[in-house]
Amino acid sequence: MPKTDWNFSKQGYIDVPGGRIWYGVVSGGNAGATPLLAIHGGPGMSHDYLYPLVDLADERPIVFYDQLDAGLSDRPNDPANWRIERFLSEIDVVREYLDLKTLSIFGNSWGGTLAAAYTSSHPKGIEKLILSSPLLNTDRWITDNRFYRESLPIDVQKVMVDCEVAGQTNSQAYEDAVDVFYRRHFCRSDPWPGYVTDTFEALNNKCYAGMWGPNEFTCTGVLRGYDGTAALSSIEVPTLMTFGEHDEAAPASCREYALAIPSVSCA
């Protein structure tokens, strides 16, 4: 179970194509309000790092779930499951199982990929959408993060290049260098909060590598070449696009994506 005290009012497992996925609901008493479905990033990460959303539970139920091959869910690690369409189908199953006829959706990073794609194609019953530093175009993401990489200390960049040339991207030296990047552009708190370390400890590297790649600035997996921007104009619900100054989803890119959404605010 998660190390952070979540105080779930309800949790369990749901059968989906490929296995079982875990879900948990946090509710502060306002059960009649429109629930918020939280979709985590990765791929292969867990719901843990989304813990700050619990602060909203006094206003509405917050529904968390771990995608297949992530967190507390089953991990068949079958590449046949690593398709966007299958992950979108999980949202339908969660909605049906928990009777979420009306809801709002929050998606972060890869979760934003799913949230945007789902809302544009399954708008019925969705009141509002929050896209938090979303991955919407892989090539743009790689370009932005390679720019960030070039801003790292020269010695850190040299370790990365030397390890990549030598085929030693699994080495401790390379992991330490990438950690410098993550501490600038994934989470800048020092030390990292427990709910962030919980997520990294639960990371399914097989799923992450198979769908994305070895790190945030190299994509060799299923999402290589992905572009979901064409669907943004089909999002009909009020949308909030959030991003931070140092986010891997660079502010300039997020502002550009927002221009395509008919009813959007940025924060």
Predicted regions, residues:
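Conserved HGGG/HGGXW glycine-rich cap/lid loop of the alpha/beta-hydrolase fold
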Residues: 17-76, 80
